[in-house]
Amino acid sequence: MVMDLRTWDDITVHQAENSVFIWEVPNPLYFKMYXVEDPLYTHTRIYHIQIRFNHNLRRALNLHKAFLNFQVWTESIRASGTTYLNRFRHLVMLYLDRLGVIGLNNVIRAVSWATDRSYVNYVLENHEIKFKIY
């Protein structure tokens, strides 16, 4: 369940499905990798990725803050952080470009599609979402 961090209310279906056309907002998403972990004695690499909605997209979706945080647990220990981030960004944007609209649920679906690979074991999500109240 996704909640608004200001009011602690659950996000409604209308708020989650609210979308805009992707060509109306230039550079709608900002991708940031803030940690790469290599646990000892395993063949696992954990990528901590944050997707931020830019100002124009937040304004169009009536959001105050939208940070989507993901931990991607992979068996791919060859890819560096920047290599995996570029691949991840490309797959997410490919999905959204094909869909044509961008919103909260569509970005989460795009991440689910981008991480549906044989080398990905788990994807953990922790989102920071605040809607404009005023």
Swiss-Prot record:
Which superkingdom does the taxonomy of this entry point to?
Viruses
Q: Does the keyword Transport apply?
A: no
Q: Which Pfam families does the UniProt record give?
A: Gemini_AL3 (PF01407)
Give the GO terms filed under biological process for this record: viral process
State the UniProt keywords alphabetically: Host-virus interaction
Biological role stated in the UniProt entry: Increases viral DNA accumulation. Enhances infectivity and symptom expression.
Family the UniProt entry places it in: Belongs to the geminiviridae replication enhancer protein family.
Listed under subunit, the entry gives: Homooligomer. Interacts with the replication-associated protein (REP). Interacts with host proliferating cell nuclear antigen (PCNA). Interacts with host retinoblastoma-related protein 1 (RBR1), and may thereby deregulate the host cell cycle. Oligomerization and interaction with PCNA are necessary for optimal replication enhancement.
Spell out the protein name for this chain.
Replication enhancer protein
Q: Which organism is it from?
A: Squash leaf curl virus
Q: What is the lineage of its organism?
A: Viruses, Monodnaviria, Shotokuvirae, Cressdnaviricota, Repensiviricetes
